[in-house]
């Protein structure tokens, strides 16, 4: 069989719980082309999904600014202006990381917080210091250390430290995220 065209596959993160739930979606809203708009599905009956939806709503204004910033950077040909816009984009990324960190700290028992922390350790280079990574792991330790998933988070955190700010990586050291 042929490999599927992953650009045309609809996907969304849904937190499913073992209880009655509904998943309302408008099939005409599924994007058939990359730039088509999509009507977001509505999941009801999952407390975890509600927490994730609250996170998305918190991040939405910042992400909207990021999308506009990315468009501006891509449309600008003046190098000095692109650099200035890129510096603004870095500040927005820092704001996103800050808001995500606060959200994780406020929802330590939630699977959403666990997933967000796991994602936080996935970027290369890691936008945190080793000390910050240890501190972040401490946020979830009490609630998650006895879970089967926690060793995976620990492993990802240890891998993230290899490219953390201030650590020697391959042939250089990342001093700051800029």
Give the label of every model feature segment:
Residues 96, 103, 120, 140-143:
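Alpha-helical solenoid scaffolds that mediate protein-protein interactions
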Residues 88-97, 127-134:
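Helix-turn-helix repeat elements of alpha-solenoid scaffolds
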Residues 151-178:
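N-terminal "domain-start" segment that seeds a small globular fold
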Residues 1-91:
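A non-transmembrane, solvent-exposed segment enriched in polar/low-complexity residues
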